Amino acid sequence: VCETAAGLVHTNTSLGIVPAGTGNDFIKTIGTPRQWKEALDFILTHPARPVNTGEVNDRFFMNVCGGGFDVLTLTYALEAKKHVKGIWPYLYGVLRAIRTFKPFRMHIQVGDDLTMDKDCMICSIANGRYIGGGIPIASMADVEDGLLDVLVVDAVPRWKIPFYLPSLMSGTLYKKK
Protein backbone atom coordinates (compact mmCIF):
# COMPACT_ATOMS: atom_id res chain seq x y z
CA VAL A 1 0.00 0.00 0.00
CA CYS A 2 2.74 2.43 0.94
CA GLU A 3 4.54 2.07 -2.39
CA THR A 4 1.32 2.51 -4.36
CA ALA A 5 0.28 5.50 -2.27
CA ALA A 6 3.71 7.10 -2.76
CA GLY A 7 3.08 7.11 -6.50
CA LEU A 8 -0.20 8.95 -5.95
CA VAL A 9 1.15 11.76 -3.75
CA HIS A 10 0.39 15.20 -5.26
CA THR A 11 -2.28 13.73 -7.58
CA ASN A 12 -6.07 13.67 -7.41
CA THR A 13 -6.20 9.89 -7.84
CA SER A 14 -8.09 7.95 -5.17
CA LEU A 15 -6.83 4.78 -3.54
CA GLY A 16 -9.15 2.23 -1.97
CA ILE A 17 -7.44 -0.13 0.46
CA VAL A 18 -8.70 -3.67 0.96
CA PRO A 19 -7.15 -5.26 4.08
CA ALA A 20 -4.84 -8.12 3.20
CA GLY A 21 -1.88 -7.65 5.53
CA THR A 22 -1.22 -9.01 8.98
CA GLY A 23 -1.63 -5.85 11.04
CA ASN A 24 -3.88 -3.64 8.88
CA ASP A 25 -3.07 -0.73 11.17
CA PHE A 26 -3.76 2.04 8.66
CA ILE A 27 -7.11 0.41 7.82
CA LYS A 28 -8.02 0.60 11.51
CA THR A 29 -7.06 4.29 11.66
CA ILE A 30 -9.21 5.29 8.66
CA GLY A 31 -12.19 3.19 9.71
CA THR A 32 -12.32 0.76 6.79
CA PRO A 33 -13.81 -2.62 7.78
CA ARG A 34 -11.26 -5.39 8.27
CA GLN A 35 -13.13 -8.05 6.27
CA TRP A 36 -12.41 -7.74 2.55
CA LYS A 37 -16.04 -7.93 1.35
CA GLU A 38 -17.19 -5.26 3.79
CA ALA A 39 -14.12 -3.17 2.94
CA LEU A 40 -14.90 -3.34 -0.77
CA ASP A 41 -18.50 -2.30 -0.13
CA PHE A 42 -17.25 0.55 2.08
CA ILE A 43 -14.85 1.77 -0.63
CA LEU A 44 -17.58 1.72 -3.29
CA THR A 45 -20.20 3.49 -1.16
CA HIS A 46 -18.18 6.16 0.67
CA PRO A 47 -16.66 9.27 -0.90
CA ALA A 48 -12.88 9.49 -1.19
CA ARG A 49 -11.18 11.78 1.29
CA PRO A 50 -7.68 13.22 1.30
CA VAL A 51 -5.24 11.95 3.92
CA ASN A 52 -1.86 13.22 5.02
CA THR A 53 1.36 11.54 4.01
CA GLY A 54 4.73 11.86 5.68
CA GLU A 55 8.13 11.93 4.07
CA VAL A 56 11.39 10.84 5.69
CA ASN A 57 14.65 10.54 3.76
CA ASP A 58 12.84 10.94 0.41
CA ARG A 59 10.40 8.08 1.18
CA PHE A 60 6.70 8.61 1.73
CA PHE A 61 4.71 6.87 4.43
CA MET A 62 1.02 6.81 5.25
CA ASN A 63 0.95 5.29 8.71
CA VAL A 64 3.91 5.50 11.11
CA CYS A 65 7.66 5.81 10.60
CA GLY A 66 9.76 5.02 13.61
CA GLY A 67 12.54 3.27 15.35
CA GLY A 68 13.51 1.98 18.73
CA PHE A 69 12.25 -0.51 21.27
CA ASP A 70 8.83 -0.94 19.61
CA VAL A 71 10.33 -1.72 16.21
CA LEU A 72 12.87 -4.14 17.71
CA THR A 73 10.04 -5.92 19.58
CA LEU A 74 8.03 -6.29 16.37
CA THR A 75 11.08 -7.54 14.48
CA TYR A 76 11.59 -10.28 17.05
CA ALA A 77 7.86 -11.08 17.14
CA LEU A 78 7.69 -11.49 13.35
CA GLU A 79 10.65 -13.84 13.57
CA ALA A 80 8.87 -15.90 16.24
CA LYS A 81 5.56 -15.94 14.32
CA LYS A 82 7.10 -18.47 11.97
CA HIS A 83 7.13 -20.96 14.84
CA VAL A 84 4.31 -20.06 17.27
CA LYS A 85 0.94 -18.30 17.04
CA GLY A 86 -1.28 -16.08 19.15
CA ILE A 87 0.17 -13.69 21.70
CA TRP A 88 3.32 -15.77 22.25
CA PRO A 89 5.40 -14.19 19.47
CA TYR A 90 4.74 -10.74 20.92
CA LEU A 91 5.61 -11.78 24.46
CA TYR A 92 8.78 -13.35 23.12
CA GLY A 93 9.53 -10.16 21.18
CA VAL A 94 9.09 -7.97 24.26
CA LEU A 95 11.26 -10.16 26.47
CA ARG A 96 14.01 -10.45 23.88
CA ALA A 97 13.92 -6.71 23.16
CA ILE A 98 14.20 -5.89 26.88
CA ARG A 99 17.27 -8.10 27.02
CA THR A 100 18.98 -6.73 23.89
CA PHE A 101 17.76 -3.16 23.36
CA LYS A 102 20.29 -0.35 23.44
CA PRO A 103 19.16 3.29 23.31
CA PHE A 104 20.02 5.12 20.12
CA ARG A 105 21.14 8.68 19.48
CA MET A 106 18.64 10.77 17.51
CA HIS A 107 19.06 14.08 15.79
CA ILE A 108 15.62 15.53 15.20
CA GLN A 109 15.11 18.74 13.31
CA VAL A 110 11.73 20.25 12.50
CA GLY A 111 12.14 23.19 10.14
CA ASP A 112 14.46 25.86 11.52
CA ASP A 113 12.79 26.12 14.90
CA LEU A 114 13.23 22.82 16.73
CA THR A 115 16.37 20.73 17.02
CA MET A 116 16.95 17.90 19.48
CA ASP A 117 19.89 15.60 20.02
CA LYS A 118 19.14 12.89 22.54
CA ASP A 119 19.37 9.24 23.43
CA CYS A 120 15.99 7.61 22.78
CA MET A 121 14.04 4.48 23.53
CA ILE A 122 11.33 5.20 20.93
CA CYS A 123 10.98 7.75 18.16
CA SER A 124 7.83 7.60 16.05
CA ILE A 125 6.54 10.02 13.44
CA ALA A 126 2.87 9.21 13.15
CA ASN A 127 0.20 9.99 10.63
CA GLY A 128 -1.87 6.97 11.67
CA ARG A 129 -2.58 5.80 15.19
CA TYR A 130 -1.56 2.14 15.29
CA ILE A 131 1.45 -0.13 14.81
CA GLY A 132 2.04 -3.84 15.26
CA GLY A 133 -1.50 -5.05 14.76
CA GLY A 134 -3.29 -2.50 16.93
CA ILE A 135 -0.84 -0.94 19.40
CA PRO A 136 -1.95 2.71 19.72
CA ILE A 137 1.46 4.38 19.42
CA ALA A 138 -0.11 7.76 18.58
CA SER A 139 -3.65 7.64 19.91
CA MET A 140 -4.26 11.32 19.12
CA ALA A 141 -3.07 11.18 15.48
CA ASP A 142 -5.52 12.24 12.76
CA VAL A 143 -4.76 11.38 9.12
CA GLU A 144 -6.70 14.43 7.91
CA ASP A 145 -5.41 17.23 10.18
CA GLY A 146 -2.38 18.22 8.10
CA LEU A 147 -0.03 17.34 10.97
CA LEU A 148 2.29 14.48 11.87
CA ASP A 149 2.46 13.51 15.55
CA VAL A 150 5.98 13.01 16.89
CA LEU A 151 6.56 10.76 19.88
CA VAL A 152 10.03 10.70 21.42
CA VAL A 153 10.61 8.59 24.53
CA ASP A 154 13.89 9.30 26.27
CA ALA A 155 16.26 6.44 26.98
CA VAL A 156 15.67 4.71 30.30
CA PRO A 157 17.59 2.00 32.13
CA ARG A 158 16.71 -1.50 30.94
CA TRP A 159 14.99 -2.38 34.24
CA LYS A 160 12.49 0.47 33.73
CA ILE A 161 11.32 -0.64 30.27
CA PRO A 162 8.59 -3.00 31.57
CA PHE A 163 7.01 -0.06 33.42
CA TYR A 164 6.50 1.71 30.07
CA LEU A 165 4.70 -1.21 28.41
CA PRO A 166 1.21 -0.59 29.89
CA SER A 167 1.34 3.01 28.62
CA LEU A 168 2.48 1.81 25.20
CA MET A 169 -0.33 -0.74 24.97
CA SER A 170 -3.02 1.69 26.18
CA GLY A 171 -2.10 4.60 23.92
CA THR A 172 -0.98 6.86 26.78
CA LEU A 173 2.78 6.67 26.28
CA TYR A 174 2.80 10.35 25.29
CA LYS A 175 1.80 11.16 28.91
CA LYS A 176 4.66 9.18 30.47
CA LYS A 177 7.29 11.26 32.25
PLM regions with names:
Residues K81-P89, G133, S139-W159:
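Gly/Ser/Thr-rich active-site loops/lids in small-molecule metabolic enzymes
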Residues G66, D70, S124-A138:
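Glycine-rich phosphate/pyrophosphate-binding beta-alpha loops
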Residues D70-T73, M116-K118, I131-G134, R158-I161:
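Short acidic/glycine-rich loop or secondary-structure boundary segments that cap or lie
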Residues V110-D112, D117, D142, V152-K177:
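ATP/nucleoside-binding phosphotransfer catalytic cores, i.e., glycine-rich phosphate-binding loops
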Residues V9-H10, L78-E79, S139-D142, P166-S170:
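Short, solvent-exposed amphipathic alpha-helical segments in soluble enzyme
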Residues H107, S124-A126, D149-V153:
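Short, conserved beta-strand edge motifs with alternating hydrophobic and charged residues
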